[in-house]
């Protein structure tokens, strides 16, 4: 989940009674992403951006600092961003292995792994020829400090990390936004083919719809609620954001045209 409380992306992997499979964490060089620098009309400006991959020798974090490409009429001249990822685990071992173009963090035999990530924009990254420079390092340090605070806030006496407590604080804030609107199309009855649907999962509702000639009101409600949740989750409290779908490509086919406006 993305925490409104702490402004970090939080992931939790647990092996239960068994240890987790080997986990490999790395950031691929941007130019290895499909369609990097490839656009319908020719070469994309991203081929002229600069970036550096950031790691520590102990494998506690990894990240990327980048300077946006410079071109005529760019709104991102002398700007950039930093994304850092903090890695925690209980049990097992961790080591860093050098690979061509990057490093990989290997975690073996862990009982649980927590991955915290944060991205920050830098509107004064400086001249392209000076990158990475002072501003990039200052932004890296600031993001790592925020991640360190999030780690300390939920660290338990046993040395693990309290994911449930972090999630509870996020739910509390998200519930306030999500609960401002309700949507109900009426009572479900046997005549409408919807008797007993209140406790059905989305998967069960979709299966029921396949066997029901008329549109299920409950399914329409669930589609609306799911879409509203996504929009609320990506909007924050400030100006609306656009929520795009990540396809693993640098220049996806929709090229930014099909996004969800959180201000709908």
Where are these predicted regions, by residue range?
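Aromatic-residue-lined binding/catalytic grooves and analogous aromatic/hydrophobic interfacial grooves
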Residues: 1-264
């Amino acid at each position: 989940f993305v925490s409104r409380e702490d402004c970090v992306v939080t992931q939790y992997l647990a092996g239960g009674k068994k240890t987790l499979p080997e986990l490999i964490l790395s950031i691929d060089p941007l130019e290895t992403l499909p369609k990097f620098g490839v656009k319908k009309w020719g070469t994309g400006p991203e081929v002229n951006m600069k970036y550096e991959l950031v790691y520590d020798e102990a494998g506690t974090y990894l990240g990327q600092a980048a300077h946006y490409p410079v071109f005529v009429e760019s709104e991102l001249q002398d700007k950039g961003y930093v994304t850092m990822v903090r890695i925690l685990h209980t049990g097992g071992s961790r080591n860093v292995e050098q690979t061509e173009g990057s490093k990989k963090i290997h975690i073996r035999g862990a009982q649980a792994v927590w991955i915290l990530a944060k991205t920050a924009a830098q509107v004064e990254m400086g001249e392209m020829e000076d990158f990475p420079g002072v501003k990039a390092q200052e932004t890296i340090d600031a993001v790592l400090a925020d991640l360190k605070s999030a780690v300390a806030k939920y660290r338990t006496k046993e040395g693990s990390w309290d994911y449930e407590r972090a999630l509870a604080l996020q739910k509390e804030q998200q519930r306030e936004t999500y609960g401002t609107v309700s949507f109900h199309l009426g009572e479900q009855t046997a005549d409408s083919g919807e008797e007993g649907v209140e406790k059905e999962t989305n998967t069960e509702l979709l299966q029921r719809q396949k066997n029901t000639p008329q549109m299920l009101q409950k399914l329409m409600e669930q589609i609306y609620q799911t879409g509203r949740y996504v929009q609320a989750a990506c909007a924050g409290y400030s100006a609306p954001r656009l929520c795009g779908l990540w396809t693993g490509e640098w220049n996806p086919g929709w090229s930014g045209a099909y996004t969800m406006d959180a201000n709908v």
